């Protein structure tokens, strides 16, 4: 009978991950991160927050935008799926600094800032296209409603 190396699913592992190292220059996710952190003006989002003195700390719009824009680039439009990606996908974890916004937080942010997000997404895509990071793939977000049977 052949002999195989043993394995055990009931073992724990401590893996050190530096999230900044997961965002490699020359990739779309790095471009999204860099543009949101260093180039785009996000002040348009700030007036809706009124928690300077009291109230719970809010998620930084930069973090929410990174999650949403990267998800859109992958064809993910469901806020529940975005939350799941933040829990399980290393690139989403890196973009969100290992935070996991609730799907209702993501959905509310998108619905209350849809025009601003659309404008920023277009800017990000144009810059990434100029840098050759898109690979000439089709990006489409379809809001078409279909009747169900």
Question: What residues fall within each predicted segment?
Answer:
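Active-site- or DNA-interface-adjacent structural scaffold in DNA-acting proteins
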Residues: 96-149
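Charged, often Cys/His-bearing segments associated with DNA-binding zinc-finger transcription factors
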Residues: 1-38
């Amino acid at each position: 009978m052949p002999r195989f190396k043993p394995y055990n699913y009931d073992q724990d592992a401590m893996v050190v991950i530096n999230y900044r190292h997961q965002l490699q220059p020359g990739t779309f996710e790095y471009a999204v991160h860099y543009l949101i952190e260093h180039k785009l003006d996000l002040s348009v989002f700030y007036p809706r927050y009124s928690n300077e003195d009291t109230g719970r700390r809010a998620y930084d719009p930069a973090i929410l935008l990174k999650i949403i824009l990267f998800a859109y680039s992958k064809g993910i439009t469901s806020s529940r799926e975005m939350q799941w990606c933040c829990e399980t996908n290393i690139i989403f974890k890196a973009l969100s600094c290992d935070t996991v916004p609730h799907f209702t937080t993501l959905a509310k942010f998108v619905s209350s800032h849809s025009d601003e997000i659309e404008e920023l997404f277009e800017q990000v895509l144009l810059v990434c296209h100029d840098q050759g990071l898109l690979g000439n793939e089709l990006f489409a977000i379809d809001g078409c409603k279909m009747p169900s049977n």
